[in-house]
Amino acid sequence: MVWASDLVQLGDGKPRCGWVSDDPLYRAYHDEEWGRPRRDPSALFELLILEGCQAGLSWITILRKRAHYRKVYDGFDPARVARYMPKKIESLVVDPGIVRHRGKVEASVGNARAWLALAAREDPVAFLWSFVGGAPKVNRPAGLKQVPAKTPESEALSKALAKLGFKFVGPTICYAFMQASGMVDDHVAGCACAG
C-alpha cells in the first residue's frame, strides 16, 4: 500500500504513522493498541483470529466488526470456539456483522482447536513470543517504506503455526499479528506513539 506521507497530523495535532486515518476507532487503535506488548493468551488468540479474518481486507474493516466478532465468537474463548458445530458455523457464514467467508470462519474453528492442542503442550504466549526472543523488537523505521510486509521471524512463526495446524497464518499475516500484539513496534520515527 502507498501512503501520502510517513506521518499524519489529525485533529489533535499529534504526529502519527501515515497509515492512520481520522476515524476515531482507527486513531484509538493506533494510539492505544498497535505496537503495545500483549501477553494475555485471550488477547493473543483474538488477534491471531482477527488477523486471519483480515486477509485481503483493510484493518479498519475488522476494527469496525470487532465488537460483533467478540459477541458471536463467545469472547474468543478458544475452548468454546473449538466446539463450534456445522450449525454454528453456518450462522457465522451468513452473519453480516463479521467477514462472511466460509474458509476464514472454518479456519477460526480449526485454529481454536490448534490453540488448545498447543496450550496442552506448552504456554502459547511463551511460544509466540519466542519468535522475537521473548522481548518486543523495536524497529523505529524512518518511514513507512521501511516497514516490511514480512520478516524472517514472521516466516518462522508462519511455518511453526502451519505445522501445528493453523490456517490463514502466512508470513504477512503473522507479521501484522506481531505488530498488533506488540511483539514488534514499527511506529515510524516522529510518531507521537514512538517510545
Task: Locate the predicted segments by residue.
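HhH-family (HhH-GPD) DNA N-glycosylase catalytic core used in base-excision repair
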Residues: 1-195
